[in-house]
Regions:
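Conserved Radical SAM active-site core
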Residues: 62, 66-171
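Flexible, acidic/Gly-rich N-terminal and inter-domain linker regions that tether
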Residues: 7-92
Length: 171
């Protein structure tokens, strides 16, 4: 009986998630998204994306505390079933793990992924394809892990993925 209760609860949470988890970026016009991409990219010239506020010019190759330039570095991406049921649903949360997290939390659970700087250099076009691929794999959302220092590039990738048909919410 308890197993049925758990299954019913998971199903209810899944349905609620699918009803209410709409991608808010779909409400924005193409022009508004482009404006936000431009505005975010300007921040990279005197980087204050994170609380460290290094103010380095990442567009000129300068590296700040996060040791990141213009190119996104992704450790891994794929469906992840380890989140809470409303987020992971039945087919997983489309998780993208970014490297070089700027917080450097002492008790970070993703230390090897987020703080060791190992990963794959990725263009915004490739990131857009990764997002769309996660949707095609049936993921219920795009789950960005340690993304703060790459927000301008993520916005640019999002602008490229929307015309391809990306509709998943970002979490």
């Amino acid at each position: 009986m308890a197993e049925i209760y758990v299954l019913v609860n998971k199903f209810i949470l899944y349905i609620i998630g699918m009803i209410f988890m709409k991608a808010s970026y779909l409400k924005l016009s193409v022009d508004e998204i482009a404006r936000r991409v431009t505005q975010a990219n300007q921040i990279l010239t005197k980087c204050t994306l994170c609380p460290r506020a290094c103010k380095v010019n990442r567009t000129k190759g300068e590296l700040g505390f996060c040791e990141s330039g213009l190119e996104v570095i992704i450790s891994s991406a794929g469906p992840h079933l380890g989140e809470e049921p409303p987020i992971s649903g039945s087919k997983g949360s489309g998780t993208i793990f970014f490297t070089n997290c700027n917080l450097r939390c002492v008790f970070c659970q993703n230390y090897q992924i987020s703080q060791e700087g190992q990963g794959h250099p990725t263009t915004t076009g490739e990131l857009a394809n990764i997002m769309f691929s996660l949707q095609q794999q049936g993921c219920h959302n795009i789950n960005l892990v340690s993304p703060t220092h790459f927000v301008p590039q993520i916005l640019e990738a999002l602008a490229l993925a929307i015309p391809k048909g990306l509709i998943l919410p970002l979490v």
